A protein has these predicted regions:
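Signature of the SF2 helicase/ATPase Hel1-core->accessory helical subdomain module
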Residues: 1-21, 137-157, 161-170
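Conserved interdomain linker/interface between the two RecA-like ATPase lobes of SF2 helicase motors
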Residues: 2-75
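Long, largely alpha-helical accessory region at the distal end of helicase-like NTP-driven motors
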Residues: 61, 65-66, 70, 77, ...
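Conserved segment of the helicase C-terminal RecA-like domain
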Residues: 151-157, 161-195
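Conserved helicase ATPase core of P-loop NTP-dependent helicases/translocases
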Residues: 72, 81-84, 92-132
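A general structural motif
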Residues: 68-70, 121, 171
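Conserved nucleotide-binding/hydrolysis micro-motifs of P-loop NTPases
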Residues: 12-15, 28-33, 78-79, 102-103, ...
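Short, surface-exposed amphipathic charged segments that create phosphate/polyanion-binding patches used
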Residues: 23, 38-41, 111-113, 187-194
Length: 237
């Protein structure tokens, strides 16, 4: 089973110190005017000014390893990627959006700019799914997830964009904005490698992740995120 094999490889690679350590923060996505971000959230809610400011505050708070940020931000819709990139740029960042319509030349230029340390180079690339696998950007030192977790495979692939070792970073920061998503239970499955879907083990991992994860990596969930994941575990068939 490919899903199981992929997760076992991640766990073993971490144990053998083959990957860059990561610090994962599962934090609550914003509630806007009593609307909780979920799988069916309206586009306008996802690009609300207050949410953008909240996201920027959090990615600044949690930071990165190195002299400057080299970040990837995964979102759920192409329109969202383009709009959020515009809004970040209005707030002083240098970002771009890459979707499936981008040419190979555009992708390569964006990746080269994200890797660069020169003035004017990209701080972030917003994308939906084209960076899930097969992309090598070793300097990535921050990954933000602004989308539902639809499978443990995709979660690990997106996390993996920051796990290449590089002498300009000691670790990668992963910030997962957790809404009230139906499939939040995939988060502990992906991070723990627990493929038998034992609900008690998944709950324990969410509560005690730092005690279980191999190597120097750490995992933290805030209390509301824990409750949302526990709820998804309880409702999962």
């Amino acid at each position: 089973d490919y899903n199981i094999a992929y997760e076992i490889r991640l766990q073993q690679a971490m144990e053998y110190d083959l990957l860059c350590p990561f610090h994962y923060y599962g934090i609550t996505d914003m509630t806007i005017d009593d609307h909780v971000i979920d799988d069916k959230s309206d586009f306008n809610l996802l690009v609300d000014e207050k949410r953008v400011d909240y996201v920027i505050d959090k990615i600044n708070d949690y930071g990165y390893s190195g002299d400057r940020v080299h970040g990837l931000i995964f979102v759920s819709r192409k329109e969202e990627a383009h709009r959020l990139s515009e809004m970040f740029n209005q707030r002083g960042f240098n970002t771009c959006a890459l979707t499936g319509e981008a040419t190979e030349k555009q992708r390569q230029e964006a990746m080269d700019s994200l890797e660069s340390n020169e003035d004017g180079s990209l701080d972030y690339i917003f994308t939906v799914d084209i960076f899930n696998e097969g992309i090598d950007i070793p300097k990535v030192n921050q990954v933000a997830m602004l989308r539902p977790t639809q499978s443990s495979i995709i979660f690990i692939q997106q996390l993996g964009r920051g796990l290449r070792k590089n002498n300009e970073k000691d670790y990668v920061v992963v910030i997962d904005f957790i809404g009230n998503y139906e499939k939040n239970f995939f988060i502990p499955i992906a991070l723990s490698g627990n493929t038998n879907f034992n609900k008690d083990n998944l709950r324990r991992f969410v509560s005690e992740g730092n005690l279980i994860i191999p190597g120097a990596s750490t995992i933290q969930f805030d209390e509301i995120s824990k409750k949302r994941i526990f709820n998804a575990i309880d409702l999962a068939k």
